[in-house]
Amino acid sequence: MTALEQLQALPIWQGTVRATPLGGGITNVNFVAEDDNKRVVVRVGDDIAVHQIMRFNELSASQAAHAAGVSPQVLYHAPGILVIDFIEGRSLTADDFQDMSLLGQAIDLVARAHREIPHHLRGPSLIFWVFHVIRDYAATLQTGG
């Protein structure tokens, strides 16, 4: 089943669902989807153990980030599927951060995320630390894997 077919089969839709691919996902496929009542972002992607990507961690982090007030709400999840509220916006550019007011807001948001999200994490919280992933790749190569 393709990512789009998985999206269309979700039990959350009312009426016709329309989906538009959303760029960015390296290890998942993302869509902006809407039905007669809501507009959401749908992420479709399975665990990739060799890269230490485990979607239950993403779910836990997303729920904690919402509880901390820095991320949209998780509306639905199933193995390989995450559905969150859609927030209208745009990606900021380097030029945007020349505005000291906007830069200050961004710094405050990142600080708040680092300070508040850990207070809302529940259950097992494994890390995804790029330096550890690279070390693990190197060890795998050294052992002939």
Regions found by a protein language model. Name each.
Residues 21-129, 133-143:
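ATP-binding pocket architecture of kinase catalytic cores
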Residues 1-18:
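Juxta-kinase regulatory segment immediately upstream of eukaryotic protein kinase catalytic domains
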